[in-house]
Amino acid sequence: MYCVQCEQTMITPKGNGCSFSQGMCGKTAETSDLQDLLIACLHSLSAWAVKAREYGIINHEADNFAPRAFFATLTNVNFDSARIAGYAQQALIYRNQLIKAVSAFESNPTLDHPLANIELNGVSVDKLARQAKQFALDTDRAKIGEEAHGVRLLCLYGLKGAAAYMEHAYVLDKFDNDIYAQYHGFMSWLGTHPSDLNELLEKALAIGSMNFNVMAMLDAGETEHFGNPVPAMVNVRPVKGKCILISGHDLKDLKELLEQTEGKGINVYTHGEMLPAHGYPELKKYKHLVGNFGSGWQNQQKEFARFPGAIVMTSNCLIDPNVGDYADRIFTRNIVGWPGVTHLEEHDFSPVIEKALECDGFPYTELEHLITVGFGRKTLIDASDAVIDLVKAGKLSHVFVIGGCDGDKEERHYYTDLAYALPKDTAVLTLGCGKYRFNKLDFGTIDGGLPRLLDAGQCNDTYSAIMLAVTLSQKLGIGLNELPLSIVLSWFEQKAIIVLLTLLALGVKNVYSGPSKPAFLNDNVMALLHEKFGLSGLTTPEQDFGHIIGKNA
């Protein structure tokens, strides 16, 4: 086992990365190795998808499957070895379909790619796990050096984050053949084990550039299905009655669940990255969508254990449900999986509803605590003139974008301290589950109107923040980096990595990121990123605030 993709990975004097019987996330060595094998098979699939496109051959099923299966290897998504092995087998089935299609144009087609002809040594999990060891992601690290290896992983993990957003868009009927072509190009290239540092950095930015279009596509899918988010108050305290908790990112699953539970006397609560759902008109109209429960994903074992109903995980982040003894009432959907947990293949939530009715539910209604969400792209852009007026009047000095992933490191209290210590003439635009560090605090308003805390949505709604910045830049006639706007990113896994690469690809400078640097990037690479893009790690809220204001003075 070698896995170094998330913030919680092992860091020791002997080296970084989880490399024993189990990762810090709870993933077994077997599952981790099988994920490496799956990635190798996906490299092969993409290599042939690139070749097939030379003849105008597009296999839509393969195009959809590839990023979806890659998503399964994201942190805290799928811990089920059998399903990972199944994805590897399916990847080669699609690969072989592409080879057959190319054979209509070439007799005995070949491909100059190290993984073009990879085959699996059987079908059993045990056999595949043994084979998988040769595809560990650190096999050539000593040969190519820490810097090149780290930036290659930056590309791989960034592309993994983009693949997740591609899958989120696809379930909302949004896809683009040009984006699929770019994805396959990057995935095929990564399978050749590239080691030129300059090329790797260029590709990292190109992956970020592609992801901007993916996020735009996802934004279109969400707004076309559910309407443009509008500011809305959300109760974060329990309401008496039977209940279901839904977590993850898949708003379509939530819509289906709301339809199927309507009139059944069951209250539905959002959790984690589902919180922004309360701002979408086509979701908030359901009266039994009563509120949000819990906090960041890392607290789920305690919070899910005391939630008296059924739970649905639609995407990341899932951790071991056996710890809190709720494995019998949690259900996985889509690409998510945990051994022994009931997986729902389709949108039939009958088992979830039955379980919710069996459970006790909340015995009484607690006193309301309301927070505000719903500051999506359209709302933010519509407010751009008001923001400019406040800036010109000297009432709004700076906007801080504080968002990204949450996690359980003590150092993450930095984000709470920073947000709460900011001057009253500043605003905080937040997105992703990092918001749970401060979104229940009262930040008040600026000049009695603009809320100082603006929740723009899920991590992929970085697109909304970017479009606000672009709009302000155009209206003020200044560059993006001249705006009184700064980004303090909270990273944990691969979605945050691709968000960072997207920002860098757009030319955004001086991003602050933490609470610690990725374990796969050494100090030399971090120094290079600081030199090229102004990327900085975190120190203290006071010191970083001083640097930010000093640069924008």
UniProtKB/Swiss-Prot annotation:
Cofactor(s) this protein cannot do without: [2Fe-2S] cluster; hybrid [4Fe-2O-2S] cluster
Positions that bind hybrid [4Fe-2O-2S] cluster: H249, E273, C317, C405, C433, C459, E493, K495
Signal peptide from the UniProt entry: none
EC number(s) on file: 1.7.99.1
Localisation: Cytoplasm
Metal-binding among keywords: yes
Keywords of this entry: 2Fe-2S, Cytoplasm, Iron, Iron-sulfur, Metal-binding, Oxidoreductase
Modified residues (Cysteine persulfide): C405
GO molecular function: 2 iron, 2 sulfur cluster binding; hydroxylamine reductase activity; metal ion binding; peroxidase activity
Gene Ontology cellular-component terms listed: cytoplasm
The organism's place on the tree of life at top rank: Bacteria
UniProt cofactor note: Binds 1 [2Fe-2S] cluster. Binds 1 hybrid [4Fe-2O-2S] cluster.
Catalytic activity field: A + NH4(+) + H2O = hydroxylamine + AH2 + H(+)
InterPro entries: HCP/CODH, Hydroxylam_reduct, Prismane-like_a/b-sand, Prismane-like_sf, Prismane_a-bundle
GO biological process annotation, one example: response to hydrogen peroxide
Catalytic class of the enzyme: oxidoreductase
Positions with a binding annotation for [2Fe-2S] cluster: C3, C6, C18, C25
SUPFAM superfamilies named among the record's database cross-references: Prismane protein-like (SSF56821)
Described function: Catalyzes the reduction of hydroxylamine to form NH(3) and H(2)O.
NCBIfam families assigned: hybrid_clust, PRK05290.1
Entry's family note: Belongs to the HCP family.
PANTHER family cross-referenced by the UniProt entry: HYDROXYLAMINE REDUCTASE
Protein name stated in the entry: Hydroxylamine reductase
Organism: Actinobacillus succinogenes (strain ATCC 55618 / DSM 22257 / CCUG 43843 / 130Z)
